[in-house]
Amino acid sequence: MKLLNQSQVSEFILLGLTSSQDVEFLLFALFSVIYVVTVLGNLLIIVTVFNTPNLNTPMYFLLGNLSFVDMTLASFATPKVILNLLKKQKVISFAGCFTQIFLLHLLGGVEMVLLVSMAFDRYVAICKPLHYMTIMNKKVCVLLVVTSWLLGLLHSGFQIPFAVNLPFCGPNVVDSIFCDLPLVTKLACIDIYFVQVVIVANSGIISLSCFIILLISYSLILITIKNHSPTGQSKARSTLTAHITVVILFFGPCIFIYIWPFGNHSVDKFLAVFYTIITPILNPIIYTLRNKEMKISMKKLWRAFVNSREDT
């Protein structure tokens, strides 16, 4: 990504979550543990899905890709956030700031489309079970994943040029733990109304639209499973509950931040922490604790690993 901006500002100062060094030390310990667990948890899901023949299904293929996105989403800024907690002055370069913004919206866009793809997968599995393997074949699954990355790239690449070429000639303090469009663009020296419209139209409306589509899809699925057997209903509802929980946890903060991106919301930076640091660790917990197949496969994989170590 080429940065063409010739502003006087060469770096941004991040205020972080608190000015208390004691609290920052506690956050350093907490975020470090969360980050390590997030990476290991999502990595465990990926390894389990792609090394277990029983999980060679469209749903788990998409879940494995979602775990990769979550692991990457947790890594685009969190390591620097953790290191900054040990510093008095939290500084990020101009290029580094907009790289964070680009990656945030790229990965956020990919996750949105993946969640819609997972909803489509559940719709076909429950509403059209006889045609499931025909519709959700390997080519379709790969196409859904590739499409999610292309749309994520389009989503991020569309709005970045408008922001990166704004003139930043003075204020450079960002009231957050990392860079994001609403907080950075409001520091520009010119009227940013057009950029505000672009952000609301691109990030806000897309987030809200995807969320509504997902709610409608899962509502239709819940209506359909009423006609299933009690056993089928229980399994389907358990899976759907996990999916819906992830959708709400991810889209809730995004909609709040980007539908009203330039309001003075003191909670914005805490919401940013939630969907970039907390949500990626909740996804593997939600999907594994409510999924017997995943838990059984993880135990088998662990036993195989332990046995292989004992043999050597």
Curated annotation (Swiss-Prot):
Its main location: membrane. Keywords: Cell membrane, Disulfide bond, G-protein coupled receptor, Glycoprotein, Membrane, Olfaction, Receptor, Sensory transduction, Transducer, Transmembrane, Transmembrane helix. One of its GO terms (molecular function) is olfactory receptor activity. InterPro entries: GPCR_Rhodpsn, GPCR_Rhodpsn_7TM, Olfact_rcpt, Olfactory_Receptors. Disulfide bonds join C97-C189. PANTHER family: OLFACTORY RECEPTOR. This is Olfactory receptor 4K17. It comes from Homo sapiens (Human). The gene is OR4K17.
